[in-house]
UniProtKB/Swiss-Prot annotation:
Lineage, highest ranks first: Viruses, Riboviria, Orthornavirae, Negarnaviricota, Polyploviricotina
Superkingdom, natural source: Viruses
Record topological domains on the Cytoplasmic side: 518-637, 1137-1148
Glycosylation sites noted in the Swiss-Prot or TrEMBL record: 142, 357, 409, 937
Zinc fingers, CCHC-type class: 555-575, 580-601
Transmembrane segments: 497-517, 638-658, 1116-1136
Entry protein name: Envelopment polyprotein
ITAM domain sequence ranges: 621-644
Length: 1148
């Protein structure tokens, strides 16, 4: 038993996994789309889902169950009597009898069904007020199975109380998911938030609203009145189709419809609401609905048995209902109510399409549910930009994006967007994780590029770390950490400066001692190496000299080359008698024997050693080695001198390292003032400017003959604006392609109405009266009769985007110049100029990806950007082309369904239709090849009936600009500028440093002039960190200046040229818990005022401001630093005591 238990456990686990797999197949999702701002009295939210087929034998036992936390209305849960009307082949037909209208028969019986969409009066109307939800289902059946469609309607307030729950129908489970979209109160259509407002079409011109096609779901409600024909709904249909003479249709009731995913109830018919009239007309044209089948049955077949009649209820003596009997894929609803009876008679007809043609008088039915589409006017909700901020979390960052109206688009190349949403009032919030902080975090949100500077996050973590290290002295821990945690070389310079100041008297002698020890060892090694080298050189010289005077140094016996004369003399004496000249041991007097002995002899260097001993020994205590050994690194004079020099050097490095690198665009830190240009010749500027960038150029133009005469010159070029004259082509639609085979045994093809004939776009081909047996199934014998009808149609139309065609294009920039007191502005087109008596500014050309006749497709809000189509069909469109299905104000434009039908036959098999044309819609093709289309960005769009203006942030769009300022200026007149500018710093927020930056609020007063174009800078005493160009008007002006830079002691002031406000304000430290991203578009500014760079005097100003800032900020930091300095001097004195005086030690 013990051995078999693991096997049993394994089998049990496998069984559980298989059970979960089976359950997963029975789980269906019902999505309820809700706006994220929900108030009182905003109607109902509705959703539906189609379930897998259920055997017809189980239908009578179906019951809709709920585990949801909302209150379900019980009116639809009760049993209701239905007449089950079915058909079958007669059993008494002889074999091989040719099929005819008499070959089939129908049967009627009474059954009880529960949970169908039989909604009593006032249930939907009071659902919102009573906080009750309605759940029901409808059936589409053939002879063997039924396709349930479950509907859920509830007060829109359930979006706040429910996130998900389960419904059950038979063995199927329905996961109800309430999904709150980014729409404030509208519905999500075409990726935009659309608010249907049906009265706009009656009261406003057509260019002020949009028209969008939206799904509508309608439910039949029975309401019987005692007198009059006001509730006889069939009368309205007959009047609409101009049918007269029908008097027997006394059913009373109305349809209650819900538009889109959420709306107020719409009553059909209603005389004073054109929406009701539109739905009524569509019901008359497509009595079974405009959605013909489920998407899984897009390619399917059905066999039509023919027209049949029957009894409803089954106790009737004559037939009261008629329809078309079929088998195969179910199409429309199989439930309805007779129009002829005053009291409702409900019919369930599996395998029969009940009569719904309102142009006949008798035996008609109305469906219990109807689904279609309706074009509605309305307005698109305005979108707002996102705010994105991040906090450091582990190795990455936790980020959050929120918008006041909703987030329709968010993506990031460096972060994982997990779509975890929160809603706070009208705001939508999305949290996500960024795994890397070694690079700046880029987030695209609501069409705007946001950049979060991660070094600011790292600074915050650094401050937290140092604050923890210095937590023993909490009074200064945070202030000291703020000074230490500065990014880049500037931060390291700060650390070295503080270390030198506090611990220099200990570190300087310690580090000097270590360096001296290393240098002494190196000097000794070098000197020793040099001694050995000199000795070898000396030996070589002696040997060469001996060879010149005495001859060869080679022994004649052993052939060994000697190095000294004594060694050669020993060889001559010993080798001839067979003795070793070194160790004097006996050996053979042959060269080979003696040389072999020399290899093992240990005294071969005896003569060289004797020579070395005879020379003078090396004295390592001379020269460099002795100087290093006797260096007095513990001298107070040396330590103090080095300490002072290091402090001065590090202060200079600290001040110089605060400058940022020069950039081609963006702000470059400069000193106060602006550049001066002597006008010895014309001033000419020629450059290329990206479409997303603005350009500011400011100089003082100096008279070369009189340096005191200067004219202020300011040039401002704004961002490029694209002006397109457009033609609104309408809304591009997506659709499901359907291919249907309808086969019946007898009669002509015109005898029956096929489902595609009520579709908006369809093609049909009939194969009539077959002459052979090869195309007839065995249960449909006969030759020369019957029909195979092939149909292709489009349904489930869905609006996917707006389409505009470019008629003409203009690229403009607003150019303003201020020369002295004269100001001129003009919106300049391409190949156009702004010309004054002294200045000429021209846009020579534009590089662009747009061309007239291009088509622009927007798949969402304009701010999301769009796609450029070079080829877009407008007249003859084929299915699958861009623009194949278009919804226009004049109606639906259907494409040509090009292709040919072929009927596939096999003996004793029902024929099947085939279509060799394209079966994929143009939209689906576009999605599959979306990357092959050019995209474009849209910022600050403005749209009207025939014009669209926007700014494209793509740097590939550029303007070639040429500026010429003539040297022939009237310096005497223009140099005298009476304009007086006074500045006051009002407020500041943000942080100093090169992180997120700060915002300085300036109050600027202009006198003596009516208007003055100039730039206001954000500076401290030494240099400036940001600027904005503004057109001042007489009086008080509030200006916001954004800057980046500075240090803890910076008091930011508002400055104009060299004049600044009298007081400055200190920004916060760059260690915010949440670092907010900035718009990349806001930083695409090129500013050039020619101001001088920060020099030596600027550095020392910055130093003084920093020191004063530290003293004013937290004087305890300075006190602690001085205490540490005194401590280090004491330790120095203790470890390095002063040497006694020489005179004191050597008194006579």
């Amino acid at each position: 038993m013990g051995k078999s238990s693991p096997v049993c456990l394994y089998l049990i686990l496998q069984g559980l996994l298989l059970f979960d797999t089976v359950n997963a197949k029975n789980l269906n999702e019902l999505k309820m789309e809700c706006p994220h701002t929900i108030g009182l009295g905003q109607g109902l939210v509705v959703g539906s889902v189609e379930l897998p087929p259920v055997p017809i034998q189980q239908i009578e036992s179906l019951k809709l169950e709920s585990s949801c936390n909302f209150d379900l209305h019980t009116s639809t849960a009760g049993q209701q009597s239905f007449t089950k009307w079915t058909w079958e082949t007669k059993g008494d037909l002889a074999e091989n009898t040719q099929a005819s209208s008499t070959s089939f028969q129908t049967k009627s019986s009474e059954v009880n069904l529960r949970g169908l969409c039989l909604i009593p009066t006032l249930v939907v109307e009071t659902a919102a007020r009573m906080r009750k939800t309605i759940a029901c289902y409808d059936l589409s059946c053939n002879q063997t199975v039924c396709q349930p469609t479950v509907y859920l309607m509830g007060p829109i307030q359930t979006c706040l109380t429910t996130k998900s729950c389960l419904l059950g129908l038979g063995d199927q489970r329905i996961q109800v998911n309430y999904e709150r979209t980014y729409c404030v109160s509208g519905q999500l259509v075409e990726g935009v938030c659309f608010n249907p407002i049906h009265t706009m079409a009656l009261s406003q011109p057509s260019h002020t609203y949009d028209i969008v096609t939206i799904m509508v779901r309608c439910f039949l409600v029975i309401k019987k009145v005692t007198s009059g024909d006001s509730m006889k709904i069939e009368k309205n249909f007959e009047t609409l189709v101009q049918k007269t003479g029908c008097t027997a249709n006394g059913f009373q009731g109305y349809y209650i419809c819900l538009i889109g995913s959420s709306s107020e109830p719409l009553y059909v018919p209603t005389l004073d609401d054109y929406r009701s009239a539109e739905v009524l007309s569509r019901m008359a044209f497509a009595p079974h609905g405009e959605d013909h089948d489920i998407e899984k049955n897009a390619v399917s077949a059905l066999r039509i048995a023919g027209k049949v009649t029957g009894k409803a209820p089954s106790t009737e003596s004559s037939d009261t209902v008629q329809g078309i009997a079929f088998s195969g894929s179910p199409l429309y609803t199989s439930t309805g109510v007779l129009t002829a009876k005053d009291d409702p008679v409900y019919v369930w007809a599996p395998g029969i399409i009940m009569e719904g043609n309102h142009s006949v008088c008798e035996k008609k039915t109305l469906p219990l549910t109807w689904t279609g589409f309706i074009p509605l006017p309305g307005e698109i909700e305005k979108t707002t930009q996102c705010t994105v901020f991040c906090t450091l979390a582990g190795p990455g960052a936790d980020c959050e994006a929120y918008s006041e109206t909703g987030i329709f688009n968010i993506s990031s190349p460096t972060c994982l967007i997990n779509r975890v949403q929160r809603f706070r009032g009208a705001e939508q919030q999305i949290k996500f994780v960024c795994q890397r902080v070694d690079m700046d975090i880029t987030v695209y949100c609501n069409g705007v590029k946001k950049v979060i500077l991660t070094k600011t996050l790292v600074i915050g973590q650094c401050i937290y770390t140092f604050t923890s290290i210095f937590s023993m002295i909490p009074g200064i821990a945070h202030s000291l950490a703020v000074e230490l945690c500065v990014p880049g070389l500037h931060g390291w310079a700060t650390v070295l400066l503080l270390l030198t100041f506090c611990f220099g008297w200990v570190l300087i002698p310690t580090i000097t001692m270590i360096l001296l020890k290393i240098l002494i060892a190196f000097a000794y090694l070098c000197s020793k190496y040099n001694t050995d080298s000199k000795f070898r050189i000396l030996v070589e010289k002696v040997k060469k000299e001996y060879q010149k005077t005495m001859g060869s140094m080679v022994c004649e016996v052993c052939q060994y080359e000697c190095e000294t004369a004594k060694e050669l003399e020993s060889h001559r004496k010993s080798c001839s008698i067979g003795s070793c000249p070194y160790c004097l041991n006996p050996s053979e007097a042959t060269p080979s024997a003696l040389q072999a002995h020399f290899k093992v002899c240990k005294l071969t260097s005896r003569f060289q050693e004797n020579l070395k001993k005879s020379l003078t020994m090396y004295e390592p205590m001379q020269g460099c080695y002795r100087t290093l050994s006797l260096f007095r690194y513990r001298s107070r004079f040396f330590v103090g001198l080095v300490w002072c020099m290091l402090l001065v050097l590090e202060l200079i490095v600290w001040a110089a390292s605060a400058e940022t690198q020069n950039l081609n665009d963006g702000w470059t830190d400069t000193a106060h003032g602006s550049g001066i240009i002597p006008m010895k010749a014309d001033l000419e500027l020629d450059f290329s400017l990206p479409s997303s960038a603005s350009y500011t150029y400011r100089r003082q133009l100096q008279n070369p003959a009189n340096e005191q005469e200067k004219i202020p010159f300011h040039l401002q070029i704004s961002k490029q604006v694209i002006h397109a004259e457009i033609q609104h082509l309408g809304h591009w639609m997506d659709a499901t392609f359907n291919l249907k085979t309808a086969f019946h045994c007898y009669g002509s093809c015109e005898k029956y109405a096929y489902p595609w004939q009520t579709a908006g776009c369809f093609v049909e081909k009939d194969y009539e009266y077959e002459t052979g047996w090869g195309c007839n199934p065995p249960d449909c014998p006969g030759v020369g009769t019957g029909c195979t009808a092939c149909g292709v149609y489009l349904d489930k139309l869905k609006s996917v985007g707006k389409v505009f065609k470019i008629v003409s294009l203009r690229y403009t920039r607003k150019v303003c110049i201020q020369l002295g007191t004269g100001q001129t502005c003009k919106t300049v087109d391409s190949n156009d100029c702004l010309i004054t008596t002294s200045v000429k500014v021209c846009l020579i050309g534009t590089i662009s990806k747009f061309q007239p006749s291009d088509t622009l497709l927007f798949l969402g809000p304009l701010q999301q950007g769009g796609l450029i189509f070079k080829q877009w069909c407008t007249t003859t469109c084929q299915f699958g082309d861009p623009g194949d299905i278009m919804s226009t104000p004049t109606g639906m434009k259907c494409p040509e369904l090009n292709g040919s039908f072929r009927k596939k036959c096999a003996f004793a098999t029902t024929p099947v239709c085939q279509f060799d044309g394209n079966t994929i819609s143009g939209y689906k093709r576009m999605v599959a090849t979306k990357d092959s289309f050019q995209s474009f960005n849209v910022t600050e769009p403005h749209i009207s009936t025939s014009a669209l203006e926007w700014i494209d942030l793509d740097s590939s769009l550029r303007d070639h600009i040429n500026v010429i300022v003539s040297r022939d200026l009237s310096f005497q007149d223009l140099s005298e500028t009476p304009c007086q500018v006074d500045l006051t710093t009002s407020a500041t927020d943000g942080a100093w440093g090169s992180g997120v930056g700060f915002n300085l609020v300036c109050t600027v007063s202009l006198t003596e002039c009516s208007a003055f174009l100039t730039s206001i800078k954000a500076c401290h005493a030494a240099m400036c960190y940001g600027s904005t160009t503004t057109n001042l008007v007489r009086g008080q002006n509030t200006i916001h200046v954004v800057g980046k830079g500075g240090h803890s002691g910076s008091k930011f002031m508002c400055c104009h040229d060299t004049k600044c406000s009298s007081t400055g304000l200190v920004a916060a430290a760059p260690h915010l818990d949440r670092v907010t991203g900035f718009n990349q578009a806001d930083s695409d500014k090129i500013f050039d005022d020619g101001a001088p760079e920060c020099g030596m005097s600027c550095w020392f100003k910055k130093l003084g401001e920093w020191v004063l800032g530290v003293l004013n900020g937290n004087w305890m930091v300075v006190a602690v630093l001085i205490a540490l300095l005194i401590l280090s001097i004491f330790l120095f004195a203790l470890c390095c005591p002063r040497r006694p005086s020489y005179k004191k030690d050597h008194k006579p």
